[in-house]
């Protein structure tokens, strides 16, 4: 049976066959080759630049070597059958002295290596300890639980430990609440709840008086805080408690205009709530039943009790229901929470889905997820086991889904290969196409809209709900950036503005893992707090250990990258490529590509091969584009097909340098590839390049003939000539995985996955370079070819069509990335190569003009600048 042409065991002659054929046709090296004529002794022929000389050293295996004079390009090009046209490119921005000076002074010391190991172990333990959610005490909710009278009928609290906690945890200023973070709304609410509870139990007179004094002096500060900083349900529960305090005779400033305004807001809100809605289905009103006691039908409300006995996971709301109904499930829930926390309760519990999703998101965005693969899988398996097509909330039995947890879950689960539908977002869309946090409500905040926006970019073809979500959230977030009061409804983060700016500027297809990690290290707050009914913290989400590990790990990896870059620069110079005057020297920018996405230390060889192969695609693209005659280019192509050094003498001098460097490099790559793959790969590499050079040649023929192909004809060839497939197919040999024929069939040139990578790369390249290339005489681009097919449309319309085709292809690429059943590293190679193209050509030709574009800053941040 004939093997597929893409197979590693294709019908390309073996390395030994090539050696024999080449030995007969290269007279300059016949003596050396004959010395190793025995088949058992044959080794691949390779060439080296002689150190400190203009000579090529020809070597056979580990045997002897002979050298022949080789004139540098600037001295003699008289052998050229045509004169190469010199095209001016901006010089390389990253100079040798800078690269050579990188001594990796920030290399991780032995003590830091030990610290990294310790942090990894501690974070693994955090994941293992995730149960129902770790969070801080809520003085407000604890005060409500402390109100419950003993069920035995005695005149005592049922949970005396909670009363004692209130007595022992008043802050120095007389308030109750989270001492770490001051929010007037939060402190006033918690303080009011505590002084009412202590008054009801006729205890803690000193604490009550201090609390009243705090209230009187600080209540006015609420007026200065943004409405978006008001805790959930504040306008419902605060006026109700204020009324209760007045009945108890507490000396509070009830006549403050601001307090009267809050009372008026409560009355207006209650008028807007139809009575039947309260009992029809679970809503966020269940979260604040303690503030609705005068209107609740307690018998009807019990139909909306959660399976765990709570009302929307709120201890305060559940305590209020229990005091009204004596429901045993309510008491069981409160006992369950106190068993976990001892003498206090949080503002909501459990928080199991929220905690797991955000912890996974944290380690992924910080770039340290590779250390926690098993823990991440366990966390996501847990979340998926509680996934609901209506959406999810912060807890597994929460009956009211929210868009924040749902969008985070949809995005992360989808990217990890779980089968989840985007239809889940329809739960949160109103009749006007707007998205909100909860069904039937108009609340939304920056953090939840940011998560919906991030989710919308992992869309599949035909998912209109994702496109609607993208447009809605982009509009909301851009407006939020202009409104200082918009930050934020649900969280107080170190730099949520920075997170939003990054997400809008570098959406999913333009955001590389190392760049996102660098950005999030700067934006991540280990002390971030969230806002529910009160301020609360999530120590397994916001934790200094994550940040410390991220910084140490980033700098460690960066030091490895710097050493690799130095080696690659030496390879470039030793290959004689500094003598080439027709091409771009972009070793650093090209190395940045794999370093930005396959950054892990174990993929060092893959990055090296990726960079070397990519450099050759640039050299040969420049050669075939405008700097070689068609005859010379055909000769070069034939030399590669035959792997034949005898044709070198017929080449122009600079083309000789290209071919010799090419020949040397890929013989070396093939040798190591054979060791890694356990079989010969030279024929495979030759075949990959054969297809590539044929695509280059076809474009050269079009250019010489001034031929403009149809759009489809152009795309078929240009998706190959962009050379991304060549880079990936050769680099894939060095991922540490054995590249089986089965895997190869799913990423070869016939696979949809690779085709989409090439298509999106070609289209984004054309949109940013077609005008400049047209000015240089190029006649074919996606835009020009589409205009040829549709002569009545404008250039702008053609450009927009190309963008549309690209966006659709990127959605299909998402689906291939998620659903392709191959090892993750191969999926990453293909998908991230497509993404890096979107980044490089975001502003313009980011490769050629890198010195004048943001790509320069990305290179610096990824490769040169350590994080502090």
Swiss-Prot record:
Outcome of substituting residue 361 to A: No effect on GGPP binding, but decreased copalyl diphosphate synthase activity
UniProt-reported outcome of changing residue 87 to A: No effect on CPP binding, but decreased abietadiene synthase activity
Activity response to pH changes: Optimum pH is 7.2 with GGPP as substrate and 8.7 with CPP as substrate.
Cellular compartments annotated: Plastid, Chloroplast
Keyword Chloroplast: yes
Annotated phenotype, changing residue 848 to A: No or small effect on substrate binding, but strongly decreases abietadiene synthase activity
Position of the signal peptide: none
Motif (DXDD motif): 402-405
Stated consequence of mutating residue 773 to A: Increased production of neoabietadiene
Catalysed reactions, as listed in the record: (2E,6E,10E)-geranylgeranyl diphosphate = (+)-copalyl diphosphate; (+)-copalyl diphosphate = abieta-7,13-diene + diphosphate; (+)-copalyl diphosphate = neoabietadiene + diphosphate
Binding site for substrate: 269, 489
UniProt-reported outcome of changing residue 365 to A: No effect on GGPP binding, but decreased copalyl diphosphate synthase activity
Effect ascribed to mutating residue 86 to A: No effect on CPP binding, but decreased abietadiene synthase activity
Post-translational modification: The N-terminus is blocked.
Effect the entry attributes to changing residue 841 to F: No or small effect on substrate binding, but strongly decreases abietadiene synthase activity
Binding site for Mg(2+) 3: 765, 769, 773
Swiss-Prot/TrEMBL keywords: Chloroplast, Isomerase, Lyase, Magnesium, Manganese, Metal-binding, Multifunctional enzyme, Plastid, Transit peptide
Pathways per UniProt: Terpene metabolism; oleoresin biosynthesis
Function: Involved in defensive oleoresin formation in conifers in response to insect attack or other injury. Involved in diterpene (C20) olefins biosynthesis. Bifunctional enzyme that catalyzes two sequential cyclizations of geranylgeranyl diphosphate (GGPP) to abietadiene. The copalyl diphosphate (CPP) intermediate diffuses freely between the 2 active sites in the enzyme. Changes in reaction pH, but not salt concentration, influence the relative proportion of the major products of the enzyme, abitadiene, levopimaradiene and neoabitadiene.
Note: The abietadiene synthase activity exhibits an absolute dependence on a divalent metal ion cofactor while the copalyl diphosphate synthase activity is not completely dependent.
Name of the featured protein: Bifunctional abietadiene synthase, chloroplastic
UniProt organism field: Abies grandis (Grand fir)
């Amino acid at each position: 049976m004939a093997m597929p042409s893409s197979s590693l065991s294709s019908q390309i002659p073996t390395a030994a066959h090539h050696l024999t054929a080449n030995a007969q046709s290269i007279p300059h090296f016949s003596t050396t080759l004959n010395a190793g004529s025995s088949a058992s002794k044959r080794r691949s022929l390779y060439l080296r630049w002689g150190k400190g000389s203009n000579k090529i050293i020809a070597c056979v295996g580990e045997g002897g070597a002979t050298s022949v004079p080789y004139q540098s390009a600037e001295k003699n090009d008289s052998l050229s059958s045509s004169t190469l046209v010199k095209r001016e490119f901006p010089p390389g921005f990253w100079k040798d002295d800078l690269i050579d000076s990188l001594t990796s002074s920030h290399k991780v010391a032995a003590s830091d290596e030990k610290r990294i190991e310790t942090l990894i172990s501690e974070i693994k333990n955090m994941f293992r300890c995730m149960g129902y959610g770790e969070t801080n005490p809520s003085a407000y909710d604890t005060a409500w639980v402390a109100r419950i009278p003993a069920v035995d009928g005695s005149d005592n609290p049922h949970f005396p430990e909670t009363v004692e906690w209130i007595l022992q945890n008043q802050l120095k200023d007389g308030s109750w609440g989270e001492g770490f973070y001051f929010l007037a709304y939060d402190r006033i609410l918690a303080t009011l709840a505590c002084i009412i509870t202590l008054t009801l139990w006729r205890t803690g007179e000193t604490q009550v008086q201090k609390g009243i004094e705090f209230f009187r002096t600080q209540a006015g500060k609420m007026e200065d805080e943004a409405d978006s900083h008001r805790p959930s349900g504040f306008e419902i529960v605060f006026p109700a408690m204020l009324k209760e305090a007045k009945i108890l005779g507490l000396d509070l400033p009830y006549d403050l205009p601001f307090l009267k305004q809050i009372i008026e807001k409560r009355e207006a809100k209650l008028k807007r709530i139809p009575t039947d809605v309260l009992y029809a289905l679970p809503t966020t009103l269940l979260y604040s039943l303690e503030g609705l006691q005068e209107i609740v039908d307690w018998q009807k409300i019990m139909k909306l009790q959660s399976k765990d006995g709570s009302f929307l996971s709120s201890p305060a709301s559940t305590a209020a229901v229990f005091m009204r109904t004596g429901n045993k499930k309510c008491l069981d829930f409160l006992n369950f929470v106190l068993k976990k926390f001892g003498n206090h309760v949080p503002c909501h519990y459990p928080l199991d889905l929220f905690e797991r999703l955000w912890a996974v998101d944290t380690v992924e965005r910080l770039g340290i997820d590779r250390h926690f693969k098993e823990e991440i899988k366990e966390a996501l398996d847990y979340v998926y086991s509680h996934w609901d097509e209506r959406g999810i909330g912060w807890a597994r039995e929460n009956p009211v889904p929210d868009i924040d947890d749902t969008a985070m879950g949809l995005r992360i689960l989808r990217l990890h290969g779980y089968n989840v539908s985007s239809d889940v977002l329809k739960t949160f869309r109103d009749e006007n196409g707007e998205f909100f946090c909860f069904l039937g409500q108009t609340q939304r905040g920056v953090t939840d809209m940011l998560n919906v926006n991030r989710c919308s970019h992992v869309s599949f073809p035909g998912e209109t709900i994702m496109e609607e979500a993208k447009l809605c959230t982009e509009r909301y977030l851009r407006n939020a950036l202009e409104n200082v009061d918009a930050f934020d409804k649900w969280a107080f983060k170190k730099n949520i503005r920075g997170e939003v700016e990054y997400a809008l500027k570098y959406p999913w297809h333009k955001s590389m893992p190392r760049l996102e990690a660098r950005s999030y290290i700067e934006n991540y707050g280990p002390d971030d707090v969230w806002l529910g009914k009160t301020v609360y913290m999530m120590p397994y989400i916001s934790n200094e250990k994550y940040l410390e590990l991220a910084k140490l790990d980033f700098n460690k990896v960066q030091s490895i990258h710097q050493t690799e870059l130095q080696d690659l620069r030496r390879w470039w110079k030793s290959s004689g490529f500094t003598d080439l005057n027709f091409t771009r020297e972009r070793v650093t920018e090209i190395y940045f590509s794999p370093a930005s996405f396959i950054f892990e230390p174990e993929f060092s060889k893959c990055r090296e091969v990726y960079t070397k192969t990519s450099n050759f695609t640039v050299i040969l693209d420049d050669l075939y584009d405008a700097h070689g005659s068609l005859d010379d280019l055909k000769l070069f192509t034939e030399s590669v097909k035959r792997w034949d050094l005898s044709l070198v003498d017929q080449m122009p001098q600079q083309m000789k340098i290209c071919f010799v460097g090419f020949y040397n490099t890929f013989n070396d790559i093939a040798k190591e590839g054979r060791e890694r793959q356990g079989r010969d790969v030279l024929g495979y590499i030759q075949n990959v390049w054969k297809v590539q050079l044929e695509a280059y040649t076809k474009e050269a023929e079009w250019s010489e003939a001034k031929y403009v192909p149809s759009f489809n004809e152009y795309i078929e060839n240009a998706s190959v000539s962009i050379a991304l497939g060549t880079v990936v197919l050769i680099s894939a040999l060095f991922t540490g995985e054995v590249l089986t024929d089965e895997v190869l069939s799913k990423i070869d040139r016939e696979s949809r996955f690779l085709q989409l990578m090439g298509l999106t790369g070609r289209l984004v390249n054309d949109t940013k370079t077609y005008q400049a290339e047209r000015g240089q005489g190029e006649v074919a681009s996606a835009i020009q070819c589409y205009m040829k097919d549709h002569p009545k449309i404008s250039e702008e319309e053609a450009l927009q069509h190309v963008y549309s085709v690209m966006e659709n292809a990127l959605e299909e690429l998402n689906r291939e990335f998620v659903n392709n059943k191959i090892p993750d590293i191969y999926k990453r190679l293909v998908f991230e190569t497509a993404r890096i193209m979107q980044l490089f050509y975001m502003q313009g030709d980011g490769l050629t003009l890198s010195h004048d574009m943001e790509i320069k800053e990305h290179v610096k941040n990824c490769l040169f600048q350590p994080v502090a």
